[in-house]
Each structure stands twice: as C-alpha cells, then as structure tokens.
C-alpha cells in the first residue's frame, strides 16, 4: 500500500449541485483524507490523500461526473504535498 496526495480542479456544472458534499461522501467511503472547496472561478478544488488505488478510484469517480446533478467538463490533477496534516475529509469555504 503506497500513500499519495493529489490536488484536482474540476470544471463544469459543479457548484450549487451538491458536488462537494457527494465528493466528501465518496472520499470518506474510500477512506481518504483531504477536502473539497468551491473556487471563485466556478470550479471545485479537491485534495485527496490516502492509498494510491483509492485515490485513483476517486479520480475516476470525479471524471465520471460525480453526482447525477453535476456535469464535469474537465478535470486537472497533479501530485500534491499539503502544508498541513489532513484528518478526515472536509468541505472548505
């Protein structure tokens, strides 16, 4: 088991449709730590840390569009080294 952290920016109809709440639920189900945060440009920023296979499952879920009410047009991901220790998976404002 190797642990990784990624940061992702999800673009499309992803705000006001419960996207960050369902992302939190999915990340918790996968045993990941991190957060989801609405950004000023209409995207959602997601930081996810944990087992590499579980992080990949979250990325796949994000690419597939998350909740039914959302529409994902584009997702960008890159490795990430959080400055703080992340516990649990939260929604940030």
From Swiss-Prot:
The active site is at residue 38. One of its GO terms (molecular function) is acylphosphatase activity. Its EC number is 3.6.1.7. This is Acylphosphatase. It catalyses: an acyl phosphate + H2O = a carboxylate + phosphate + H(+). Residues 5-93 form the Acylphosphatase-like domain. The keyword Disulfide bond applies. SUPFAM superfamilies: Acylphosphatase/BLUF domain-like (SSF54975). Belongs to the acylphosphatase family. It comes from Salmonella paratyphi A (strain ATCC 9150 / SARB42).
């Amino acid at each position: 088991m190797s642990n990784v952290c990624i940061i992702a920016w999800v673009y499309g109809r992803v705000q006001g449709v419960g996207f960050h709440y369902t992302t939190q639920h999915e990340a918790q189900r996968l045993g990941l730590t991190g957060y989801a945060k609405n950004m000023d440009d209409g995207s959602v920023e997601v930081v996810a840390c944990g087992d590499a296979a579980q992080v990949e499952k979250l990325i796949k879920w994000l690419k597939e569009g998350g909740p039914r009410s959302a529409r994902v047009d584009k997702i960008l991901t890159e490795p990430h080294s959080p400055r703080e220790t992340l516990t649990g998976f939260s929604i940030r404002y």
